[in-house]
Amino acid sequence: AREMLTGDLGVGRVIARPFIGTWPNYERTIRRHDFSLAPPRQTVLDALKAEGKDVIGVGKIYDIFEGQGVTETYPNQGNEKNMEKTIEIQKKEFDGLCYVNLVDGDMIYGHRRDIAGYAGALTQFDKQLGEFLANMRDDDMLMITADHGCDPGYTGTDHTREYVPCLIYGKEIKAGVNL
């Protein structure tokens, strides 16, 4: 099957998304699995690993990169548990990157157009973000971004066209500086 995914029309991954329930009351479970192809060239994860840095993946990071460049992984358990794991990792000594994927806003609420669920997930993340920020060391850097929009108030179930933010924070990062 992997040979079929390469060439001019190649894809990076095939996603298996299990559902529970029956129509129209079915829902996705967190037990998804990505069958990925290895990245075609070196990634930032590979470069960090080659320098002896920790590359810790939380959520589906290992799956997305087929494990390439990842030194430690914690599979997806949903946003709240993924943030709990991230805060646990943050409290340990490590030197490198902790790459976290919080997929609930997209997978569970965005595509299903569940505005109340989406708002609840953001509220929960906001609470945990406060704890994360309080634990940041002076030389830590936090980057928050997304790969696409998924407005739960829009029609249909596809991705939407919002601009994707890139928020960067660190106690030693100066405002207005080109990173």
PLM regions and their residue ranges:
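Feature captures the catalytic ectodomains and active-site-proximal regions of enzymes
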Residues: A1-L179
